[in-house]
Amino acid sequence: MTLYDVPAPAKLNLFLHVVGRRADGYHLLQTAFRFIDLADTLHFEARADGAIGRAYELPGVAESDDLVVRAARSLQRATGTRQGAQIGLHKRIPQGGGLGGGSSDAATTLIALNRLWGTGLSRSQLMQLALPLGADVPVFVFGQSAFAQGVGEDLTAVALPPAAYLVVQPDAGVPTAAIFSDPDLTRDCASVTIADFLALPTFCFGRNDLEPVVLRRYPEVSGAVRWLFEHGLRVRMSGSGACLFAEFPTLPEAVLAQEEITATMRVAGKTTSHTHPGFRLVQASTGLTEHPLRNWIAS
């Protein structure tokens, strides 16, 4: 049996506050997650020999460090299944962009192989397997827009209004660990409540506490923020960056902004009097109400 074109959507952190740090070094966060329709796709083919093989390569990521492979092996160990899988992956979500691409791929692997192998784990059981893979993995198994606390595992579903987004990737990759270990990172933001978050338009609420650190360390990102502001876009960083996003009421408005930005970049590239930061990605996306695989799991 084979599962083709299984989606792994990107996420946005609509805000991200660092409210403390545990004794073990993990940071305590408050954030709101929303999925968007920018997505990787995976393919899963069952194997009778129990092996986990990957029919793709990720630059700089060894198979032993690949979250997809680790997720598959974690599900094998937890269930005792003797089945294996050959896995394909088509990347569309930028790596090192703060959009949760690797975490989403891992969650989709848990969900899809649970279905392919017939292992029958519940959502809560899959979320328990997800957390050791990374703090962002559980929300993709949770499958809904969520207000998150703790290290990201304490999730409460929230209903968000329809929205679209313009996602921009500056010409930089940001290692998450380096940002969280920066001595200048603010780690004592006052706690907020879900009611606080829902009382304001989502793009007006809070901030991303990681953003000042990234802007200071990565001129490509700070330059992109300035350039976009000069061209009429107020953006916020997702996760630890480097991707930035602006919110719009409708997808046509986000598409128009995408077209205007790319047209301006083309003009700037042909003249000596104008410059642009050189984006790797400019993508209009729709905010999702839930994960496309949410109904693949028994609650």
From Swiss-Prot:
Keywords: ATP-binding, Isoprene biosynthesis, Kinase, Nucleotide-binding, Transferase. The keyword Magnesium does not apply. GO terms for molecular function: 4-(cytidine 5'-diphospho)-2-C-methyl-D-erythritol kinase activity; ATP binding. Its EC number is 2.7.1.148. It catalyses: 4-CDP-2-C-methyl-D-erythritol + ATP = 4-CDP-2-C-methyl-D-erythritol 2-phosphate + ADP + H(+). InterPro entries: GHMP_kinase_C_dom, GHMP_kinase_C_sf, GHMP_kinase_N_dom, IspE, Ribosomal_Su5_D2-typ_SF, Ribsml_uS5_D2-typ_fold_subgr. GO terms for biological process: isopentenyl diphosphate biosynthetic process, methylerythritol 4-phosphate pathway; terpenoid biosynthetic process. Pfam families: GHMP_kinases_C (PF08544), GHMP_kinases_N (PF00288). The active site is at K11, D136. It comes from the Bacteria. Pathway: Isoprenoid biosynthesis; isopentenyl diphosphate biosynthesis via DXP pathway; isopentenyl diphosphate from 1-deoxy-D-xylulose 5-phosphate: step 3/6. SUPFAM superfamilies: GHMP Kinase, C-terminal domain, Ribosomal protein S5 domain 2-like. ATP binds at P94, Q95, G96, G97, G98, L99, G100, G101, G102, S103, S104. Catalyzes the phosphorylation of the position 2 hydroxy group of 4-diphosphocytidyl-2C-methyl-D-erythritol. Belongs to the GHMP kinase family. IspE subfamily. NCBIfam families: ispE. This is 4-diphosphocytidyl-2-C-methyl-D-erythritol kinase.
